Design a protein with these regions (language model features):
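Short, surface-exposed amphipathic charged segments that create phosphate/polyanion-binding patches used
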Residues: 94-101
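Short, solvent-exposed aromatic-acidic interface loops
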Residues: 172-182
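Well-ordered alpha-helical segments embedded in enzymatic catalytic cores
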Residues: 41-44, 101-105
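Active-site-adjacent alpha-helix immediately C-terminal to a catalytic or transition-state-stabilizing loop
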Residues: 103-168
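Active-site-proximal alpha-helix that buttresses catalytic centers in soluble enzyme cores
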Residues: 1-94, 126, 132-139, 147-156, ...
């Protein structure tokens, strides 16, 4: 409670479920869907995410991210907000803009006092982790935000417990979220 746990808000970083391989997919990367195994992963993960009761769902507009949160969106009747700056291409072109878009989600989460789930791609997650490590209240927390790829396995999430301080947002705890069975 000393760190402000009673006032902490949750922000869930979700890595999309297993997608079709880039090699075998003939369409655009933005339209690359999740596999049947990925659909099972997403279904199982969404049951775990529901335990955090995310009332705001945000996602890269790319299909595999949307498909990962789709069941949760349908079951909770909550819309998904598409954030263009969180696509792989947008991050590759303008990583600072991607961080600002993600940082805005942190601000909205703290201001609205609602749990947010954000589905993103591996390289984008790595870039966000680079910034998030600096927001961690303790070094041991920062170490949980892995500094090398793949950062997180597909179809898993990290729950960040964030408080608002006079110096800005501070991450006071991190929990890994992964389905037991899929």
């Amino acid at each position: 409670m000393q760190e402000g746990g009673a006032t902490a808000q949750n922000l869930l970083i979700v890595r999309h479920a297993k997608a079709e391989s880039r090699k075998s997919w003939k369409g655009t990367d933005a339209n690359r869907p999740i596999t049947p195994k990925g659909a099972a992963m997403a279904f199982a993960l969404n049951r775990e995410l529901a335990c955090f009761n995310p009332t705001r769902l945000a996602t890269s507009p790319w299909l595999r991210c949307q498909e990962t949160l789709q069941v949760l969106s349908w079951q909770t009747e909550r819309p998904m907000e598409h954030i263009n700056a969180l696509t792989e291409d947008a991050f590759a072109e303008h990583p600072a803009v991607s961080w600002l878009a993600f940082r805005e989600q942190i601000t909205q989460t703290l201001n609205s006092r609602e749990t947010t789930a954000i589905c993103m791609h591996r390289p984008v997650i790595g870039g966000m982790y680079d910034h998030l490590r600096g927001l961690c209240a303790r070094k041991q927390l920062a170490k949980q935000l892995i500094a090398k790829s793949p950062y997180m396995p597909t179809g898993t999430a990290m729950s960040l417990f964030i408080i608002d301080t006079p110096q800005g947002p501070s991450i006071i705890d991190i929990q890994k979220v992964s389905p037991i069975v899929y």
